[in-house]
Amino acid sequence: MKQSQVRGRGTSHLLLGAVIVGIMLVVLLEVIVQLLPPHYNPTSQSESDLAVGPYGFLMALDLVIGGVLLLLFIVAFRRVIPKEGQSRSGLILLGVAAICKLTIAFAATDLTPRPETIHGTIHAVVALVSFFCEALGLLLLARSLRHVPNMRPSPRFLVGLAIVTLVWSVIVIVTVVVSTQIEVWGLLERVATALSFVWVLTVSLGLWRFPSLDGMPGRRTIPSSPGEHLEQEALPRFT
C-alpha cells in the first residue's frame, strides 16, 4: 500500500511538473516566433497568424504543446484530487478544449478578415469553441475545489480568476462574431490565453505540493502499538 502511494506521488509529480514546464515552453516559443519574420502585430493579429510563415511550424508546435499539457493536467487533477473535489463536466470541457487546440495546430488559419478556405473556417470555429470550453471548464473545476479542505491556492481565488477568464473569453468570442475590424483583437485573445494558463499554472503548482503537505485533508494519525503512532494518509488516494 505504502509503495503504491509513493509510486502514485511520483507519477503525479511528474505529470504536474510536465504541465508547469509545458506552460513555460509555450510562452517561450510564442515569444521566439513573434520575434521572427514576418513580424506580425501582436496587438491586432491573432496568435494563430504566427503559424503562417517561414517559422509557422514553431507556432504549430506551440499549439500542440498547449493541447497536450491540458490533457496532462486533466490526468494529474484526477489522480491528486479526491472525487468529491472533481467536476466531471469541467474535466470533459477541458478535454474538449485540449482536442480543439490540437486540431487548430493542423488546420491553418487564413490571413484574411473572414475565413476563405475550409481549413480556415475549421480553425476559426474550433478556436472559438476552445476558448469557451476551456474557460467554462476551469470555472467548474474551481467551484468543485471548494469541497477540498485546506486546498491551496484558495478555491475562492480560483473561482474569481476563472470567472474573469470566462468573461474575457466571451468578450473575445463576441468581438469575432460582431466585427473583424477590431484593432486590438490580438491583444484580447492573448490576454484570454494568458488568464487560462495562469489558472492552470497556479493550480498545478498547488497540486504539485498537495500530496506531501502536512495537515492536508485525510491525513490522520493512528496507533500502531502502545505508545507509538503512525501517520497515514486517507486522502488524496493515488491509483
Model region roles, listed by residue range:
Residues 1:
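Short, conserved interaction/coordination micro-motifs, predominantly
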